[in-house]
């Protein structure tokens, strides 16, 4: 029946002003009931299982139904801080997600599960940041169109509903009054109470006569919340990030939690050293030995006043920085700056310079790079003659 589909609460809006959900099917015409505004099952902090109270005589197929709220400790933790739910124009899912465990259904009977949201009062609220508290800001805005959200698996046998936890993870909240996607329309900065309904799909043709007997409503006070477009209480934001598995990116983005691994500057990986040629490896080892000898000798040398401004070069750079670069293997013939300095050969042999009293030692000239090796041999032969 259209009245059942259009509004979950008669005080919100007349039935003719509320649009039908997009997922309505032929079986829904048999759900000829209208939810009462005040008679529903209330849960308390000490009562995890909802019990029927004040709903009149019920069909045996719904009278024994009991509902348990999942994640109850998390809901209570949010409720102590003042739960906030984001509403957007496109629609936003609830967190914590409304999940229940159902018991006592007829395993062979068909049931439909749905939710609606009722305002807790006729006030509009604002958040005072200096006192971290919600304050009354005035009278409530005009009521939004009342809608109900059918679980997408409805209708289903009681055995299927009781087999697993029922989750309303597809339910979305919006503040768009022109929404045509079937989302629940709420006013921002208003407080709401979710309600859960179990409806027996009566196969009788005159099921409209028994409409008030074929449903049972449940209310969990710890699930009430304030609709907001952005979180007001920073503690709510922190709790949602910490408990929401889909907020993993926010937790990893915290710079304080990044691991700090010290890495040496200008270091060369070990495997790149193995790719060098044997000649370069040998030259690198010799230079490392020379560097260590130079550092040892410098430690024994007394410090000069003019050398106290800057440390020795081998202290500024680690020995590993003197290794040849990997690209030098690609061009074997190219000169390498990292190698030992080579004496430049003279373009022509120098004459044997002699003085009046003595003759200059040719080995000294060769050692200074003034004479090539061939010239050194020639001068030695002449001296022996």
From Swiss-Prot:
Record feature DNA-binding region, as residue ranges: 69-252
Keywords recorded for this protein, A-Z: DNA-binding, Nucleus, Transcription, Transcription regulation
Biased composition (Low complexity): 331-347
Polar residues bias spans: 293-307
One Pfam family it belongs to: T-box
GO molecular function: DNA-binding transcription factor activity; RNA polymerase II cis-regulatory region sequence-specific DNA binding
Family matches, as CDD domains: T-box_TBX1_10-like
Ranges that cross the membrane: none
Compartment(s): Nucleus
Alphabetized SUPFAM superfamilies for the sequence: p53-like transcription factors
GO CC list: nucleus
Region annotation (Disordered) ranges: 283-310, 328-359
Main location per the UniProt record: nucleus
GO biological process: positive regulation of DNA-templated transcription
Disorder: Defects in Tbx10 are the cause of a cleft lip and palate (CL/P) phenotype called Dancer (Dc). The defect is caused by a gain of function.
Free-text function comment from the UniProt entry: Probable transcriptional regulator involved in developmental processes.
Protein name per UniProt: T-box transcription factor TBX10
Higher taxonomy: Eukaryota, Metazoa, Chordata, Craniata, Vertebrata
Encoding gene (name): Tbx10
């Amino acid at each position: 029946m259209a009245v059942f589909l259009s509004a979950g609460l008669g005080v919100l809006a007349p039935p003719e002003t509320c649009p039908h959900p997009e997922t309505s099917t032929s079986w829904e015409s048999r759900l000829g009931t209208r939810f009462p505004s005040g008679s529903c099952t209330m849960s308390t902090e000490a009562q995890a299982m909802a019990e029927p109270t004040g709903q009149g005589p019920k069909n045996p197929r719904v009278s024994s139904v009991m509902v348990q709220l999942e994640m109850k400790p998390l809901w209570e933790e949010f409720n102590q801080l003042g739960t906030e739910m984001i509403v957007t124009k496109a629609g936003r899912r609830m967190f914590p997600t409304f999940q229940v465990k159902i018991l006592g259904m007829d395993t062979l009977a068909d049931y439909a599960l749905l939710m609606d949201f009722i305002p807790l009062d006729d006030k509009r609220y604002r958040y005072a940041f200096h006192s971290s508290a919600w304050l009354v800001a005035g009278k409530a805005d005009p009521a939004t169109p009342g809608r109900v959200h059918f679980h997408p698996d409805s209708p289903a046998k009681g055995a299927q509903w009781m087999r697993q936890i029922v989750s309303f993870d597809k339910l979305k909240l919006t503040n768009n009054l022109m929404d045509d996607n079937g989302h629940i329309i709420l006013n921002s900065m208003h407080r709401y109470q979710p309600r859960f309904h179990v409806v027996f799909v009566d196969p009788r043709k005159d099921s409209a006569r028994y409409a008030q007997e074929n449903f049972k409503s449940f209310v969990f006070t710890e699930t009430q919340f304030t609709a907001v477009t952005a979180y007001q209480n920073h503690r709510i934001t922190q709790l949602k990030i910490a408990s929401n598995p889909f907020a993993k990116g926010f937790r990893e983005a915290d710079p304080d939690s990044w691991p700090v691994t010290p890495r040496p500057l200008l270091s060369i990986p070990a495997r790149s050293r193995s790719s060098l040629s044997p000649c370069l490896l040998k030259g690198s080892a010799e230079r490392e030995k020379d560097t260590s000898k130079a550092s040892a000798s410098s430690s024994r040398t007394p410090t000069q006043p003019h050398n106290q401004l800057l440390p020795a070069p081998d202290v500024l750079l680690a020995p590993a920085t003197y290794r040849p670069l990997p690209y030098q293997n690609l061009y074997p013939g190219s000169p390498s700056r990292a190698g030992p300095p080579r004496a430049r050969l003279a373009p022509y042999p120098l004459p044997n310079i002699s003085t009046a009293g003595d003759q200059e030692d040719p080995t000294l000239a060769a050692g200074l790079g003034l004479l090539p090796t061939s010239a050194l041999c020639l001068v030695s032969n002449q001296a022996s003659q």
